[in-house]
Amino acid sequence: MYLITLLSTIVPILLAVAFLTLVERKILGYMQLRKGPNVVGPYGLLQPIADAVKLFTKEPLRPLTSSVSMFIIAPILALALALTMWTPLPMPHPLINMNLGILFMLAMSSLAVYAILWSGWASNSKYALIGALRAVAQTISYEVTLAIILLSILLMSGSYSLTTLITTQEYIWLILPSWPLTMMWFISTLAETNRAPFDLTEGESELVSGFNVEYAGGPFALFFLAEYANIIMMNALTTILFLGAYNNPMAPELYTTNFATKTLLLTMSFLWIRASYPRFRYDQLMHLLWKNFLPLTLALCMWYVTMPIMLASIPPQT
């Protein structure tokens, strides 16, 4: 039974990832006044399937000087972690209802750094290594603000469990009382998932393709799947944290529809941002975090800690 529930989560995620690639290419196409993929199937709808078949039937080449075991493990680890992070997400019922769901997700996203680092190092290529080091520095840096923002939100909800956030937001979305946090959270998720304008790891102009430059066929597809699964997961988490979907216990399907719509809109905004903005310079990326976001989030965290104490009240205990 547990295997069925696991598959009923993983299969739709992978399907969503497949069609997200198509949506991205379509949006970028129309924003650049062209059609995008429109040959395979009606309106290009079968393009993701054709891409998958092409990638997985290719020979998985690897450089002679590469470290074999790490080179193979890295993409598998990346996808495994990307899928593991979905377990505590309430949709409206999580796969595993964890008391420390948020902490688990932070730990998993930190582990994803290893997959990138190993892939860059095991490739034995200068470009891949520089791309991997950039990715690691960027991910670790932005995780600092993500953790502080999460702490501030949890102070409002009163529990580390994600399901409590649904109850907290019955009357008001947390985006309204904590909009500065929401803005910084959204920009940090862009950086965390290595998306434009923070896609320095894949800087085509200087690093060819970044940490996955030496990968071909299947392993490359696994990295690709992991990246897009992370994008959807981050937007799902944003929806749960700030745009709490309406939850009626009598009709849980309403929650799922509401949740999916908001996640889709946020994901579309990721693609819109990619089509609109140029890439940041590396030092600007770091300055934005360490000199702007970090002091601001720390100050706001202090504010959210002191407010209940000043008003002599505590958040609801669960």
Swiss-Prot record:
Parts of the chain that traverse the membrane: 3-23, 70-90, 100-120, 146-166, 171-191, 222-242, 254-273, 294-314
Membrane topology annotation: Multi-pass membrane protein
EC number: 7.1.1.2
Origin superkingdom: Eukaryota
Keywords tagged on the record: Electron transport, Membrane, Mitochondrion, Mitochondrion inner membrane, NAD, Respiratory chain, Translocase, Transmembrane, Transmembrane helix, Transport, Ubiquinone
GO biological process: aerobic respiration
One Pfam family of this chain: NADHdh
Catalytic activity: a ubiquinone + NADH + 5 H(+)(in) = a ubiquinol + NAD(+) + 4 H(+)(out)
GO CC terms in record: mitochondrial inner membrane
InterPro entries in alphabetical order: NADH_UbQ_OxRdtase_su1/FPO, NADH_UbQ_OxRdtase_su1_CS
GO molecular function terms listed in the Swiss-Prot or TrEMBL record: NADH dehydrogenase (ubiquinone) activity
Function noted in UniProt: Core subunit of the mitochondrial membrane respiratory chain NADH dehydrogenase (Complex I) that is believed to belong to the minimal assembly required for catalysis. Complex I functions in the transfer of electrons from NADH to the respiratory chain. The immediate electron acceptor for the enzyme is believed to be ubiquinone.
Family: Belongs to the complex I subunit 1 family.
Protein name: NADH-ubiquinone oxidoreductase chain 1
Protein's organism: Phyllostomus elongatus
